[in-house]
């Protein structure tokens, strides 16, 4: 039986993805239905992460048009925010703190694979709402992009897409992606993918946030429209 308090939370807590309210086994399905488009592309020179900027209330009302859905979590890594705003921000704070603690104790940065694995452990065991982020970064082994599902599964790929705009964005990337492409080309492709998703997906829109990740660090920029990002 559905709890009225949960219904109230569902309706009024801002989301950058989904806030689950029933069977936890349906978390990933719900994330895909209710909002946001996040894209991660790896190249030989680094990683590009792109997201839209829209947050919604209950998936029906646009509550914010300037959300930064990408955060730096490591000297050479970033992660997207997907889920309720509070849950996603708490998740990133916890992950960033663990990565910093590791670096202090070991006097070396966490590898991107270990960082993604830690994110998966947090997603599975923590009190976070439908976390389905992308982790992208660069380490001694090269460029990496991982998707983390709500059950804690961690998968590495050359590129990945999460959120309700997944099908449209993936279709845009599929025929044009090449691991040997330049960072500039990957940036343009990521922008086109998010823009295409925003044209058809009501949960995505209002510009784009871009993160460019190399072995020198992370640079994050936000744009109100797709033309100015190109």
UniProtKB/Swiss-Prot annotation:
It is found in: Cytoplasm. Residues 1-10 have a biased composition (Basic and acidic residues). It is an enzyme of class 3 (hydrolase). The formation of the proteasomal ATPase PAN-20S proteasome complex, via the docking of the C-termini of PAN into the intersubunit pockets in the alpha-rings, triggers opening of the gate for substrate entry. Interconversion between the open-gate and close-gate conformations leads to a dynamic regulation of the 20S proteasome proteolysis activity. Its EC number is 3.4.25.1. PROSITE patterns: PROTEASOME_BETA_2. Pfam families: Proteasome. Residues 1-29 are annotated as: Disordered. Residues 1-35 form a propeptide. It catalyses: Cleavage of peptide bonds with very broad specificity. One of its GO terms (biological process) is proteasomal protein catabolic process. GO terms for cellular component: cytoplasm; proteasome core complex, beta-subunit complex. Component of the proteasome core, a large protease complex with broad specificity involved in protein degradation. Belongs to the peptidase T1B family. This is Proteasome subunit beta 2.
């Amino acid at each position: 039986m559905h709890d009225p308090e949960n219904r109230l939370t569902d309706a009024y807590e801002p989301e950058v993805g989904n806030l689950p309210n029933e069977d936890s086994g349906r978390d990933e399905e719900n994330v895909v239905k209710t909002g946001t488009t996040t894209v991660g592309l790896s190249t030989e020179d680094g990683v590009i992460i792109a997201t839209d900027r829209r947050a919604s209330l209950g998936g029906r009302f646009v509550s914010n048009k300037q959300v930064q859905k990408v955060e730096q979590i490591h000297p050479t890594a970033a992660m997207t925010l997907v889920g309720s705003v509070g849950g996603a921000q708490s998740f990133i704070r916890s992950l960033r703190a663990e990565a910093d603690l590791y670096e202090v104790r070991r006097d070396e940065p966490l590898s991107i694979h270990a960082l993604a694995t830690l994110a998966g452990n947090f997603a599975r065991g923590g009190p976070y709402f439908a976390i389905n982020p992308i982790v992208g970064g660069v380490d001694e082994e090269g460029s990496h992009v991982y998707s983390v599902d709500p059950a804690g599964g961690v998968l590495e790929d050359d590129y990945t897409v999460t959120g309700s705009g997944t099908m449209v964005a993936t279709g845009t990337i599929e025929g044009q992606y090449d691991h040997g492409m330049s960072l500039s080309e990957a940036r343009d492709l990521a922008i086109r993918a998010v823009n295409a998703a925003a044209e058809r997906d009501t949960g995505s829109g209002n510009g784009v946030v871009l993160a460019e990740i190399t072995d020198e660090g992370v640079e994050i920029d936000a744009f109100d429209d797709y033309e100015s990002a190109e």
